């Protein structure tokens, strides 16, 4: 395509744009920028040549100094050129293939470049929303918002309007206009002295009550420039601090200094805006406009920093509350833990010991529920303390401290069991369990009976009859088996202690 159309920088507007976006420039050359706007407005091919040159400079360029200068030229041309240039800029193809690609993650541009591109797309979408033939940028803007792209906050009062007001001088026919490069040699930036068009001065001047122009002498201009250097220094320091500081992790002294710089720079901007509309010196006005743009950019970055910082503080506060509740709910068995100390605070009477409760048990009851009902009500933590106390004494020690004169005066679980065994004057015999009866029943008449897989209905009926006969020979489950070696005379005297022991062990 470049072979067919030629080098984009070979045209008159392309040559000016190449010089205005040279990376060796220390700052924007507003003289060249305004000359580019004049060529676009006065020539037939000016808008197309300018778009081609801007695409060449912006596409795939990793020199972000040149990219920033090209974006400034593009913004200036949109503000000072007419509908022919707006049609090419607001085109969906130009926005998507040039500007959106600059901020793609694979290019990883600096934050200042991302903010500049997003601010341009947002401003153009707001300005061209009501124009049916300029809605390409509006569609791109809506798509980026749906994808979660966060646009910088724009101070609409401080920004210049996009649509250029009507010229005070009638616009000449572009076809009848002879390019300036053909009639006279192009002068350099240092000797260029033609004033900018009326539209530029009208756009940049805010709607303030102007009492009259100020004609400053050389001494006043020198003093004003020294003050502007101070403003630039404050702006640079503020920008570097915003680059280094992380929202939510900043130092208190750095944050206080940043807020003080913000207040100072805003007061300075108010004075600069007043001077822009009143100073008649063109060079001073350009410097004031440049400083004002720098202030607006750093203010946008500061507002974004404050939003991130406030969001982080709210998130940290919610996380702090959650962690505090979680720590209170955890079980801590340390010496100073509230979970261990708090249940003992305010206790008026010591809990009854396990020995005293076991001494009051009615061991003559026939059921476990009756034995359990004789226990006193106690709290779970009291039962834990009593269990810990009983673990401290061995079985032998408890037997030494027990007197067997009164069965109700026993001092522990082991003593109560020993006392009951001595009173019964018999050694308890193990009670056969229900599982033993079931095993005997299963072994009855089934030792040699192996079932095969293929069983007829007659064999199955026979098997059921054998099972029924075996079930009739099995004794009832509650009664002990007949082969138990227990004398019949001692059955009645042995039954009661055995059930009492079972009830006690069930506890």
UniProtKB/Swiss-Prot annotation:
Single Gene Ontology BP term?
signal transduction
Give the family this protein belongs to, as stated in its UniProt record. Answer: Belongs to the TOM1 family.
**Organism listed in the record:** Mus musculus (Mouse)
Q: What does this protein do?
A: Acts as a MYO6/Myosin VI adapter protein that targets myosin VI to endocytic structures. May also play a role in recruiting clathrin to endosomes. May regulate growth factor-induced mitogenic signaling.
PROSITE patterns assigned to the protein according to its UniProt record, in alphabetical order: GAT (PS50909), VHS (PS50179)
Q: Where is the VHS domain?
A: 20-152
Q: Where is this motif: Clathrin-binding?
A: 329-334
- UniProt-listed Pfam families: GAT, VHS
What's in the keyword line of the UniProt record? Answer: Phosphoprotein, Protein transport, Transport
Assembly state and interactors? Interacts with clathrin, SRC and TOLLIP. Interacts with MYO6.
Tissue expression summary: Ubiquitously expressed. Splicing pattern displays tissue specific variation.
* Stored CDD domains: GAT_TM1L2 (cd14238), VHS_Tom1L2 (cd16996)
Gene3D superfamilies in the record: 1.20.58.160, 1.25.40.90
Identification of the protein by name: TOM1-like protein 2
Ranges where the GAT domain occurs = 219-307
Which stretches are tagged as biased composition: Basic and acidic residues?
Answer: 498-507
